[in-house]
Design a protein with these regions (language model features):
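RecA-like P-loop NTPase motor core of helicase/translocase proteins
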Residues: 1-264
Length: 264
């Protein structure tokens, strides 16, 4: 190949594939904790510089090409919904659009030329977490305008958020910088302004996905982050790690592999 994938990228992707394609007999005893929600989350911990975006491209290619080849296989989906933490990241993720001029699938040889037509059968939507926000009944009650329409139903909400993908079912969600997406712990409320803002963002992000899952079903939610921690109120950060991490290539690993420059 012209472009060799990093070991950490292959390790991450092979783990995700194995969790779906391996026989159940091989997965006996493996129990991946839930985040407490109704849809499944899987987290890949990969340090900055480890190539998370390329792994996302590999994940999308694997999902879409398999679904295009085996339409009846419910383990796969051709509908990909990517949530970014900001406009800058969202712009950077445009390389995951299958028809883009600078797409990673062709640029890094993720998909052979002969399979590009199958890949293009998929639909990839990239949005910002703010797009998941909606007005609650409480917020509507405080509205001073004459517009007193109630909160949107899940169906209306999903149609607005998903747009051209509104009729999709069994959607694969990819959370980039997923440490911004966690379920609020009632026993650990944010105290500072920054903590309250982080809590608000996390609540909007995850609750929005809950509504999408309720109306359209989320096949699986794949989290990517270099720092997948959620506030726990405990002094030991390790206790705040996402419980659903399935592969871990941290900062020290990245430095040893030469993917990350040694801090001075």
């Amino acid at each position: 190949r012209q472009y060799q994938f990093f070991f950490c990228q292959l390790d991450a992707m092979e783990t995700l594939i194995w969790l779906v394609e391996a026989p159940d007999a091989e997965k006996v005893g493996i129990d991946i904790p839930s985040d407490g929600g109704a849809f499944r989350r899987i987290c890949t911990k990969l340090c900055t510089g480890g190539g998370k975006t390329t792994v996302m491209a590999m994940l999308i290619a694997w999902m879409v090409c398999n679904k295009a080849t085996y339409p009846q296989d419910k383990r796969f989906s051709k509908y990909i919904f990517i949530v970014a933490p900001g406009l800058t990241v969202r712009s950077r993720l445009q390389v995951l659009q299958t028809g883009g001029a600078d797409n990673y699938y062709a640029q890094f040889g993720v998909v052979p030329v002969g399979l590009m037509d199958k890949l293009r059968q998929g639909k990839v939507m990239i949005t910002n977490w703010q797009a998941l926000a909606w007005e609650t009944d409480e917020a509507i009650a405080k509205r001073k305008s004459v517009d007193k329409r109630g909160a949107k139903s899940d169906e209306a909400y999903v149609r607005e958020v998903l747009g051209e993908m509104a009729n999709a079912q069994n959607i694969v969600v990819i959370n980039d910088e997923a440490h911004h997406a966690w379920r609020r712990n009632p026993q650990n409320k944010g105290k500072t302004k920054e903590e309250k803002e982080a809590e608000k963002q996390a609540t909007i992000w995850v609750s929005g996905l809950d509504r999408i899952n309720k109306a359209r079903n989320i096949l699986c939610c794949y989290d990517f982050s270099a720092t997948p921690f959620a506030p726990s109120g405990k002094k030991n950060d390790e206790e705040a790690l996402f419980g659903w991490i399935v592969s871990d290539f941290g900062l020290n690993d990245g430095i040893e592999a030469g993917l990350v420059k040694t801090p001075r």
